[in-house]
Structure formats: structure tokens, C-alpha cells
Amino acid sequence: MARDAGVAHLRSSDTVLAALIESVGPLGDSRTGRPDRDDDYGALVRTIAGQQLSVAAARTIYGRLTARFEDRPPTPQEILADEPEELRAAAGLSRAKVSYLRSLAEHVISGELELERLDELGDEQVVAELVAVKGLGLWSAQMFLMFHLERPDVLPVGDLGIRRAMERAYRLPELPDPDTMDAIAQPWRPHRTLACRYLWRSLANEPG
């Protein structure tokens, strides 16, 4: 099993991470509660809805959003057809996030963002495609890579949870900067995504 091989690699390559893995225990299914693997648009909608929120708040907001559309992710056409203020109030979204959802829908409908191509692209190319959409920054693109496309070797150096978990696990004097994080994570390659899941889990704060 791919995860077993990844865990074995992480355990053997980093004694600090090995101890953390032992402490955290088995991980759950990263796809639980998420849009289907073939629903790229739904996954991006979920990512936007959860930006800059706690894990619990993100799940609540996304649940309210899908409840407005028969408990499923909305289509691009449905987002654009909905009245923005009504959507904002019903789901508890900020006005900025409503504008981001509309921008995403417009990019998909116009063909500027070809979701069906993303699986064929490398990680950096996927990021470049996504950050061209208003409201989708590097962090959002990396979450999409990790949790939807299930790319195995992603390290989101801007994620506060990962920084806090590294600071605690490695007994750092302060939150690590990107260079420090890259250096710590080098031995984890090509399983940095899996390592990050353990780091999040150590804080009980895996994005959901």
C-alpha cells in the first residue's frame, strides 16, 4: 500500500517525525466529507469557502453552502445564477468569497480554466493555472493539490498549522521560515504531503 511505504520512508528518514507518527497514530481517510475525486470544481468551491477559517468553521460554512444546493457542491452555472447577497447570507460567506466563487465560475464557463487538464499537469503548472483565478492563491492551490489531486510531495510553507507543528515537534525557537521548513522536509521527499498530514494531525487541525 502506497501510504504504508510512505510511512516507512518517513519513519526511517527522520527520527523526530518517527516519534510524532507514533504519537499521532493511524490517519483517517483524507477524502472523507470531500467532493468526489472527479469533481474538481466542487473541490475548489470547498477550498474557497474554507479560506482563513478554523477547520470547524470551514466545515460549517461549506455545509451551509451545499445545503443551499440540495446538499451537493453547486455548479458554475448555479453560482452565477444565484443572487450574490442571498448566497452570502445563506451560507455565511464574506462578500469577498462570494466574488471569488463567481470569478471561479466565470473562469470555468469561459474555458480560461480547463479543469479537465489539471490531472495531466505537474504540480507547479497546476498552481500557475489556479492562481490566475481571483481568490485562489498559493495556499488554496496547494490544498487542492494535496487533498483533491492527491499529489504526494507538496509542502505548503505558508500554512500556519504546519509552521506551528514544526516549531513544536522540532523544538524551534520561533515559527520556521520557508527555508527552514524546506531544509527540515528534504528527507521526507517524495512523501511531504503525508508528512504534513501527520503534522496537522499532531495539532488536531488537518484541513477538512
Question: What is the predicted role of each segment?
Answer:
Residues 1-32, 98-99, 112, 119, ...:
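C-terminal accessory module of base-excision DNA glycosylases/AP lyases that mediates lesion recognition
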Residues 18, 42, 46, 58-62:
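Short amphipathic alpha-helical segments
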Residues 36-40, 56, 74, 95, ...:
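Residues at secondary-structure transition points
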Residues 36-52:
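Alpha-helical scaffold segments that form or flank carboxylate-/histidine-based iron centers
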Residues 43-48, 64, 83-86, 125-129, ...:
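A general alpha-helix detector
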Residues 53-134:
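Alpha-helical ds-nucleic-acid-binding substructure associated with the helix-hairpin-helix region
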